[in-house]
Amino acid sequence: IPESAEAFLACDQTEQAILEELLHKYEQRRRIKLTREAGGLRLVASGRSAHGSLPEEGVNAISILLGFLRGLPLAQNAAEAARIFYMLCGEDTDGRGLRIACADEHGALTMAPTQVQLREGQIDLVLDIRFPVSKNLAWLKAHILEIIEPLGLRLTAWNGKEPHFIRPDSPLVQSLLTVYQEESGDMRPPLAIGGGTYARAIPNAVAFGPVFPGQPRLEHQAEECISIAQLLRLSKIYAAALYALANQDWPANQNIVQE
């Protein structure tokens, strides 16, 4: 989730004063810094970074900036683009703006704008969307096109992967869960996450750790770190898990994973 976004608005001194007054009325004004430069104003929005699969835990700087720009008397194309983009993805993280909000027993869809830029007269917007295991890429693409095409928008790039999902009752998950529960005392069921892990590259694999319940999620953050105590606790759990998997009596011709 981007923690910074900026825009330069070409304007004269009279227009600069008007924009400064409008910023004072914006509810997120404390997150936007306005600087006078030759030929106009530079706006820098500051948010709070978060993992792409957890947009609700961050403050998206792009959404803050779009929220301000949509109410400005900009050139027609820019004003309309800011308004439409904010309507589609600036107000929520669950896809309601694009009408793709959905959820199943393993989790809900998340969505966040991660890039927006004006170049060669074209405004590009990049979205990060993580969808539930009960949906697929074809469903997602069809629903997005249904919404954006009547607005005059085009889908110029599409890059995605189907969910990687292993059933909670599979032998692999149950073996790992048993080890974790014995070592931690935490009896909660396993969970599915929106993050893409290296497990996706291995057919018979799942992500296992390393964050314990209640701990702050520091991956991909400016202060990413892990304590020695946590590493030692993890090592104990991982060693027990490897031992359990290596000594499991797996059926001769049966995959340890039931997809």
How does the language model describe each region?
Residues S46-S49, S53-A112, Q117-E120, R130-K135, ...:
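An extended, acidic, His-containing surface patch that forms the Zn2+-binding/catalytic region
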Residues C11-T14, Q28, G39, P73-A75, ...:
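Short glycine/proline-enriched coil/turn segments at helix->beta-strand junctions
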Residues L9, L65, L127:
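Residue-level signal for inorganic ion chemistry
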